[in-house]
């Protein structure tokens, strides 16, 4: 207890050591640091540029929605009040508007599953090979229109949370997509056939692909015309000969008047 009472505290030792100068440490004089604006102001050179921004709207941001830097008063302008839905005027729409074609039924948002399932099978490539270009063009846009109707019905069903008709719509969409796939297949076949025909025409001397004259000039055209003329002359000669042969018996059957004897000569002639 006596030793502890005579031992100085750590705080007292610190004060003693700071108050008594150490013989090993040199004596230096330090100036007091001030945090006032006058002492902390940076030195300004004559050639230094002024980077001060004089914009009155500095700090306002439309992205961060910081708003204006001062309050604005709009008490002098009356603010608009929302109108209840039941008091809004009725909007007149065109009954024959083209956007109605996106709905299968104008009275119902989505048809029932039995009505959605009423559709035929898809067209096959064999059936479409016999169709013209115009028919394939019309059928393609009919399929595109049907797919737009299906997409509109699916969006309305998901928005309303009806929960029915998804499987039927998927089957209907698959049938339409299969038809469009067959149309593409047929058009690809026709394109390949056209390419092969162009390659053959480039080597054919009777075909001219320059576009400066007739596209097809057969080499045996003159031969056919000469043969037809020769056949026509032969037929005309044969017809003339037949007419002459038919005229000869008629000429022999009618005797001339000079060769017929008179009645007196016939009586004078003695009978044997």
UniProtKB/Swiss-Prot annotation:
Superkingdom of the organism of origin: Eukaryota
Compositional bias per record (Low complexity), positions renumbered to this chain: 17-29, 227-238, 249-259
Alphabetized Gene3D superfamilies for the sequence: 6.10.330.20
Q: Where is this region: Disordered?
A: 1-29, 56-87, 227-272
Protein's UniProt keywords contain Ribosomal protein: yes
Q: Where in the cell is it found?
A: Mitochondrion
GO annotation, biological process: mitochondrial translation
Question: In Gene Ontology terms, what is one molecular function of this protein?
Answer: structural constituent of ribosome
Q: Please give the Pfam families that the UniProt record associates with this protein.
A: MRP-L47
Gene Ontology CC, one term:
mitochondrial large ribosomal subunit
The record's comment on protein family reads:
Belongs to the universal ribosomal protein uL29 family.
| Matches recorded under PANTHER family | LARGE RIBOSOMAL SUBUNIT PROTEIN UL29M (PTHR21183:SF18), RIBOSOMAL PROTEIN L47, MITOCHONDRIAL-RELATED (PTHR21183)
Quaternary state and interactors: Component of the mitochondrial large ribosomal subunit. Mature mitochondrial ribosomes consist of a small (37S) and a large (54S) subunit. The 37S subunit contains at least 33 different proteins and 1 molecule of RNA (15S). The 54S subunit contains at least 45 different proteins and 1 molecule of RNA (21S).
Its protein name is Large ribosomal subunit protein uL29m
Please tell me the species this chain comes from: Chaetomium globosum (strain ATCC 6205 / CBS 148.51 / DSM 1962 / NBRC 6347 / NRRL 1970)
Q: Which gene encodes it?
A: MRPL4
């Amino acid at each position: 207890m006596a030793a502890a009472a005579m031992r100085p505290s750590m705080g007292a030792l610190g004060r003693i050591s700071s108050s008594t100068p150490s013989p090993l440490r040199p004596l230096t004089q330090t100036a007091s640091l001030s945090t006032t604006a006058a002492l902390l102001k940076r030195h300004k050179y004559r050639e230094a540029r002024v980077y001060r921004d004089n914009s009155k709207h500095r700090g306002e941001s439309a992205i961060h929605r910081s708003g204006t830097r001062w309050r604005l008063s709009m008490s002098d302008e009356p603010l608009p009040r929302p109108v209840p839905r039941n008091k809004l005027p009725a909007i007149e729409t065109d009954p024959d508007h083209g956007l109605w074609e996106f709905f299968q039924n104008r009275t119902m948002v989505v048809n029932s599953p039995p009505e959605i399932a009423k559709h035929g099978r898809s067209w096959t490539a064999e059936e479409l090979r016999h169709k013209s270009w115009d028919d394939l063009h019309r059928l393609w846009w009919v399929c595109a229109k049907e797919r737009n109707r299906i997409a509109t019905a699916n969006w309305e069903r998901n928005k309303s949370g009806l929960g029915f008709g998804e499987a039927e719509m998927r089957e209907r969409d698959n049938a339409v997509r299969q038809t469009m796939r067959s149309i593409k297949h047929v058009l690809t076949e026709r394109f390949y056939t056209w390419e092969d025909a162009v390659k053959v025409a480039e080597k054919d001397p009777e075909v001219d692909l320059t576009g400066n004259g007739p596209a097809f000039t057969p080499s045996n055209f003159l031969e056919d015309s000469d043969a037809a003329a020769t056949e026509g002359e032969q037929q005309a000669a044969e017809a003339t000969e037949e007419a002459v042969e038919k005229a000869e018996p008629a000429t022999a059957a009618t005797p001339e008047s000079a060769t017929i004897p008179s009645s007196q000569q016939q009586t004078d002639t003695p009978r044997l």
